[in-house]
Design a protein with these regions (language model features):
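N-terminal accessory segments that position/regulate proteins before the catalytic core
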Residues: 1-438, 444, 451-500
């Protein structure tokens, strides 16, 4: 970004000068500083640093440990096809290969879309299909890398796997995202956590979840990751009871030339969860009715997508719909949003999240701004112009190379927090906990949309200050995450099935 002229008028406690004042990437670190008590946070010097364009970014190669590559079992899709949606199998002894099938159901590529500028697509969303969150699978002594594209586990031979470590790689995201890389990793960790919870649940594998406990980068070195500054501290999922507490260790220094990443790593290491392991609870709301669109879980995961455009165009479009969206689809979305994250700290952080939605063309609901609370939608302001107002304040508007269907979308959902309240209740841990909780919730919304024959696109590109005016948020609230729920447009493009 270009440094602005020195004189400017601050519109809110968190603001930047010049045309970049609504840039969500640049605003993120200011909200963190505001939460910690700075009433008028100033942008750090690296805000104005010149960075390569995102499209020039080449992600680093997989962090493969030494050792053989073992192919995962096939047949996961057939097993999911035999599970009627929305039913979840009753608890019982899991098959010997159940964990491996759950991993394939969570992380395995679903399809490739040749006309889409970003590929491949998994059961959960990821910006630019970068998938910065990696899974390592171990037996308590050694670890192997899960390589979804190769449908394999790579690394030293181990006993039967009992532990999964989830960690996000900051350097998988273009450096142009600067401090925002930390937020993208935390949000995607929440999405992955729900996707994995669902996979384990569908294959009958109970588990516990252990959050990072502080103490430094020792857990990353146990995974074989010596460049610890590239990675977030891992969350552990155990299928044979909670595993051992990882030893402490110091981080390797961040190389010169990326000052924002130094701050990202410091913030991640400050987020120390006070509670220990907790059961991995359900990812699926109870009492969902049978859906007329998807007969089984394989079809649901196939239908999840973020909106498509033809001819390699970017963005998304929401097609016209002759009849309103049935009320039952919004009721199901509310049910999915109401399932709390599995760990007590995450669940408490999600209680601090406000969910606001702009609704239109949905049976039984007036067009306007609604607040989603306790499984119900409460009208805050009748406003048929709100969808157009949102599109006008979206960072990637309609253009010859970009689609933008927000003005036509039946539902756009916003997850917001008050950073001061988060820090007062949880300390620095609240920042990441709220982001994980919002990622968990939005993946549920994505699945609800797929079950209704709709798409859901998680986004962070709304211009925050004018968007908050449209949906009625206070100046001390920040938008953690949004999702546009629209009607899929038929593009005529191929969808290559990559499932196993």
């Amino acid at each position: 970004m270009t440094a602005p002229a020195p004189e400017w008028t601050r519109r809110a406690p968190v603001d930047l000068p010049g045309p970049e004042g609504d840039n969500s990437i640049a605003r993120e670190s200011l909200w963190y500083a505001y939460g910690r008590g700075d009433d008028r946070p100033e942008p750090p010097p690296w805000t104005w640093a010149s960075t390569p364009p995102p499209d020039s970014h080449v992600p680093p190669g997989p962090p493969r440990p030494a050792g053989p590559s073992r192919v995962l079992p096939t047949g996961t899709t057939d097993r999911l096809s035999a599970l009627a949606y929305p039913r979840v199998p009753a608890a019982g002894p899991a098959a010997p290969d159940a964990l491996l099938h759950a991993l394939a159901a969570t992380f395995g590529p679903v399809r490739r879309e040749p006309e889409n500028p970003y590929n491949e697509h998994r059961p959960y969303a990821s910006p630019r299909c970068l998938f910065p969150v990696h899974a390592f699978v171990g037996d308590g002594a050694a670890w192997r890398l899960l390589e979804p594209a190769r449908h394999a586990l790579t690394g030293p031979d181990t006993e039967a796997p009992t532990r999964i470590a989830l960690t996000g790689r900051y350097t998988a995201i273009p450096v142009a995202y600067q401090w925002f890389r930390g937020s993208l990793v935390s949000i995607e960790l929440g999405m992955v956590l729900r996707a994995l919870s669902l996979g384990l649940e569908l294959f009958g594998v109970p588990a516990t979840l252990t959050p990072p406990s502080g103490g430094g980068a020792g857990p990353l070195r146990e995974l074989g990751l010596e460049r610890t500054w590239e990675w977030s501290l891992p969350w552990f999922v155990d299928v044979a009871g909670p595993g051992p507490v990882a030893r402490a260790g110091r981080d390797a220094p961040v190389p010169a030339g990326d000052p924002s990443l130094t701050h990202v790593v410091r913030v991640d290491r400050e987020q120390t969860y006070p509670a220990g392991p907790a059961p991995l609870t359900t990812a699926v709301p109870a009492g969902l009715p049978d859906g007329p669109v998807v007969p089984d879980w394989a079809e649901l995961l196939w239908r999840r997508h973020s909106g498509r455009m033809p001819r390699a165009l970017h963005g998304m479009d929401s097609a016209p719909r002759p009849a309103p969206v049935p009320a039952r689809h919004l009721a199901a979305a509310l049910a999915w949003l109401g399932v709390p994250p599995p760990h007590p700290v995450l669940a408490a952080a999600f209680d601090a999240v406000t969910v606001t939605a702009v609704v239109q063309h949905v049976e039984g609901y007036p067009a306007g701004v609604h607040r989603f609370e306790r499984g119900a939608a409460h009208l805050r302001k009748a406003d048929p112009t709100a969808p157009a107002g949102l599109e006008a304040n979206y960072g990637y508007g309609l253009s010859p190379v970009n689609g933008c269907g927000i003005a036509k979308a039946p539902l756009t959902v916003f997850f917001s927090v008050r950073p001061r309240e988060l820090f007062a209740r949880f300390g620095p841990t609240g920042w990441g906990a709220a982001q994980l909780a919002c990622g968990w919730a939005v993946h549920g919304l994505c699945l609800a949309a797929a079950a209704a024959g709709l798409f859901a696109r998680p986004v962070r590109a709304f211009k925050e200050i004018p968007t908050k005016e449209v949906i009625g948020l206070a100046e001390d609230e920040t938008i953690v995450l949004s999702a546009v729920v629209g009607v899929p447009r038929e593009t005529g493009g191929d969808q290559l099935d990559l499932r196993t």
